[in-house]
Amino acid sequence: MLLIAHGFRDGLAAIVLGVQTPTAAQHAFAIAIALCFLAALIALHVWATRRSLQEPRAMQDGLQRIVDPLQARLLQPLISRQRYRPQDITVAPRANGRPPRHEKYCELVERGFNGWRFEVSGLVEQPLALTLDELRSLEAERQITLHKCIQGWSYTAAWQGVSLNAILDRCRPTPLARYILFRTFDDKWEEPGHGEYYGVIDLGLARTPQTLLAYDMNGQPLPTDFGAPLRLRLESQLGYKMVKWIRSMELIASYDDIGAGYSGWRADLLHYSRLAPI
């Protein structure tokens, strides 16, 4: 619209050719180049859409080889801290998905998660098994942050929990540990062929500021709709990387043999990206 408002032909020639006072021939040449570019762009989108529908895994693999290294090098090293105010908190935040419905989880909900222990295992020097009360007894961190979903909606909420960095300091990962595997109570795996719901993040991401294992939301115990008893808050990523209904965590060297080997249930089944930086 700005290009049209300021003179389409002259503006286009300035953008494409770098010419401030174009001739008629230069006008035509700039328009031809722009049309060719648009045609190529449309063709690329048509090809990519068809290919992703026909061979989603091949498309995922191809993009992962190109996009993931760029995101890891350019975006992941950036340190971000959100600082929203209490008045920014969304009155009625949207919950995505449904709580687990299987018997074991429902029994834990009825007991207020008494008897549940958050287990930390794998490539660690000191395995842990912490009750919800023990997690609450650790130094708490509080933050008000904006949650962004890949579907386009968002909400702002206050979270309280224990820093994932503090848990890592307690369990002391071995030099072989590179990733954290979160296992959950989520029962999407009960659908045939879907496998266990899980999520994986790398240790570098786990140690970034405002990365919490949250047990409270907006001053109240975490609701089941939002991931009770424990959910991951990873504020530099889109919502699907923040695993809910956490059962345990395991330090691992590789996730190649977990699920389909793409670092999470959504990446395995829905072909989501391994990284989701905001």
Regions found by a protein language model. Give the residues of each.
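N-terminal Sec-pathway targeting helices
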Residues: 26-34
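Structured, non-membrane catalytic/scaffold regions adjacent to prosthetic-group chemistry
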Residues: 7-19, 23-27, 46-278
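Hydrophobic alpha-helical segments
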Residues: 1-3
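Hydrophobic cores of alpha-helical transmembrane segments in multi-pass inner/ER membrane proteins
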Residues: 33-44
